[in-house]
Amino acid sequence: MVRDIRDLTSDPGAYAAELQRRWGGLLSYRYIGRHHASMNVGPVDDTVIVRHDMRDVTGGILLSVFGIAAPEGGLVSDLEAVPNPVVHSCQVLDAGVDVRRFEVRTEDVKRGQRMAYSRSLIVDADHPGRVLAITEGQGVTIGVPPEGLPKMTVEPLEVIDSPDLPPLWQVFAGRQVDATTWTLPELSAEVASPDAALHVGPQFVMTETAARSSITELAGTGALVGVSSHTMFVARAKSGPFTFVAEPIAGGDAVFGARTQVYDEGADRKLVTVATHLFRHAEQGRAS
């Protein structure tokens, strides 16, 4: 069982050591190469290098990659609070087929006693005037850590870009049941937030994967470009296995939607997350 770091609040040394272990081992940010200067030792670097596994079959950047890179929640770091996500949205202006790197430009919207809000522009790092996506979100503080926590040392993962890289859903141990249903195994430390709940990273990846899969079945093609995503985290996903069930919806003008519900099977099939994704049909191609 993954431990909730809030159990260590009365022991600053143990809390700091556990946060270092958990943050340093969290797969979401390390796998896509996202550095958070508010948490990590080292220089500020808000760019992400785009690999083959971060693109769909048309070459567009995946909605889940934008979500992991800009998780929002009000710029509240784990050094000052125990944050939890509430709502996240992403609107894509440019799929970034020829973009090699993108930069996340986040701004604090408002921070209250418990609730916090932020938004970001995601731009082409080599041509900053080119906006790829807009994200925004809301987070909540569910605990207060000991004072004086130091920044974390995080060893980056060296992922060599290749067309043969496994899809992100496979990296996070996802499994397909059918066209509309996917699963993740029981909660493990590398996919858990410090408060012992399924991190937003695998949730972004698997809700998009289930949505795309369901629409591919409906539309008869996987050549789908992400348009938008909206995710509501309605309860902490604490146990697992987790089931992702998507409902595809056909629209007009080659636009398709999917509504996905996430259930914690280890907690009496509790509904923990709901997400909506929009895609448009496009000609299949390769990223240049």
Residue ranges and their predicted role:
Residues 48-50, 92-93, 187, 233, ...:
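Hydrophobic residues in beta-strands and at strand termini
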Residues 48-61, 186-198, 203:
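A short interface-forming secondary-structure element
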Residues 209-247:
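Glycine/small-residue-rich hydrophobic helix-like segments
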Residues 1-88, 98-99, 119, 129, ...:
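Hydrophobic, helix-prone linear segments
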Residues 2-10, 68, 72, 82-83, ...:
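HotDog/MaoC-like acyl-thioester-processing domains
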Residues 1-47, 137-191:
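Non-catalytic linker/capping segments at the edges of enzyme domains
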Residues 61-84, 199-224:
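Active-site helix/loop of acyl-thioester processing domains in fatty-acid/polyketide metabolism
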Residues 30-36, 86-93, 170-173, 227-232, ...:
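Short structured motifs
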